[in-house]
């Protein structure tokens, strides 16, 4: 399978990407159902946004109290609550991911253990279990962030599982990945940049 978007173009759009990520994606992207330029551009734009330009393969939860109030208002409804959790990533994860995605309550520690990792930032005990089943071998959540091949495969699994290659809309794909439209402007910008460039 040939990538419809060249490595030169990829490097222009994601200049700080981890070395080898383009090759790792190229080797797997067809398994995600991304066989044309539009589908590949969508995959790269969304994964590029989720991983901070293919730099971070682990969710950053080091929020200020104001960031918590703005991003996770449901879990931090007032400044006093937000200030108790400020700059405490493990406590933040355990609160925002408690009792959902297969995780236990806040005290279980599941939120931190199963926080977002990989290109697509898979999150939650249920998603990690489903990914392990698809992969056909047992892995620990921490293995995903430290292994480029696994980081790419989480995105391939997620893309295939949720049939994202069939959604020809940045907004629709973003909602499936994010649950809302966080970062929609950047996602659209990346997608357009990947689509307008010619194969070098």
From Swiss-Prot:
GO terms for molecular function: chitinase activity. It comes from the Bacteria. Signal peptide: none annotated. GO terms for biological process: cell wall macromolecule catabolic process; chitin catabolic process. Belongs to the glycosyl hydrolase 19 family. This is Glycosyl hydrolase family 19 domain-containing protein HI_1415. PANTHER family: FAMILY PROTEIN, PUTATIVE-RELATED, GLYCOSYL HYDROLASE FAMILY 19 DOMAIN-CONTAINING PROTEIN HI_1415. It comes from Haemophilus influenzae (strain ATCC 51907 / DSM 11121 / KW20 / Rd).
